[in-house]
Amino acid sequence: MIASWGKRLIDWLNTYTFPEEMRFDHPAYAAEISARYLDLTAAHGTTTMASFCTIHPTSVEALFTEAAKRGQRIVAGKTCMDRNAPEGLRDTAQTSYDESKALLEKWHGVGRLSYAITPRFSPTSTPEQLEALGVLWAENPDCLMQTHLSEQVDEIAWVKDLFPNARDYLDTYEAFGLLGERGVYGHAIHLEPREIDRLKDVDAALVHCPTSNTFIGSGLFDMAGLKARGVSTGLATDTGGGSSFSMLRTMAAAYEVAQLNGSVLHAGQLLWLATAGSAKSLHLSDKIGTLEVGMEADIAILDLASTAAIAQRYNNATHHWDRIFPTLMMGDDRAIAEVWIGGAKQILS
């Protein structure tokens, strides 16, 4: 469903996402797509992913099984929805708790695998489901909790209708124990001052998804403003809702969004966001994100002259950042020379 034409977030979910997610109830299909997903992300130089699986436990089993075969580090969880989704894509407060708990107990901490408690977003969960998942997180505080926050203005209005007593969108999570240091909140474009204060207070992580935010017309993430407020931020492709598997393309989009917001991201800042910054957001800074001695050897080696246009800029550069920047702006999978995962060189497809 990547790069599927759509009008707005809810339209896109109903037209493309939900019908595709229905198919993951079938183990063979879930296994096929899991393998293809890991092949495509590796080919674009990505070695660690945080993924929303579907509501089906089979989808989580398939992704973790395939990642374990490859020795790959991955964070994933069963998406939980008990309303405002089609028949066949809804669970209940109790089944979301029970199935998430069973998957967590089976997979979390096995090899390089981590489980994330995963309510899709407030509109598709009843208060009862959010409460149940908050209880599960409290019982397993070493897990991440991942969800979406304040992606589009009309989505926020919908949240206000569904949760009339909530102070704001973030409060629909906070009220049920789903705000914390190990919380990871995607998009977070249209935040209220109170929300920013609370995210900073608990040291939660926001995830900037520039390709999907522009692709679906959600808005411009205020990287500079949030950085000035001390809010932790990572960078992600949001593959299903975006237009590319490439973190290089995502870095270029982040640069462009910053420019539209009146700020400039240096090449070093972009690389940090895609590596150490994102590792920090996933609480994996002690394992991945840098080339320091003792870190896990997840490495992407870039060809800084992968196309004629990039090579021309590279050959005329006089400073190392000037040699790197063209690849960040114009690079794609052709710029990925080698990928190593867990110290093993990958055969790229």
Regions found by a protein language model. Name each.
Residues A175-R182, M223-A311:
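His/Asp/Glu-enriched, well-ordered alpha-helical/loop segment
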Residues T58-A188:
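Metal-coordinating catalytic core of metallo-dependent amide/deamination hydrolases
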Residues L191-A204, C209-F215:
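Long hydrophobic segments that form regular secondary structure
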Residues E296-S349:
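C-terminal cap of metal-dependent C-N hydrolases
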Residues G71-R73, W137-D142, L178-E181, R198-V207, ...:
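Glycine-enriched alpha-helix->loop->beta-strand junction motifs that scaffold or abut catalytic
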Residues G45, A67, I117, H148, ...:
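Divalent metal-coordination and catalytic microenvironments
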Residues I2-Q72, S96-G109:
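Alpha-helical scaffold segments that flank or form the walls of functional sites
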Residues M1-A30, G71, K78-A93, Q152-R182, ...:
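Active-site gating loops and adjacent loop-to-helix segments of metal-dependent hydrolytic enzymes
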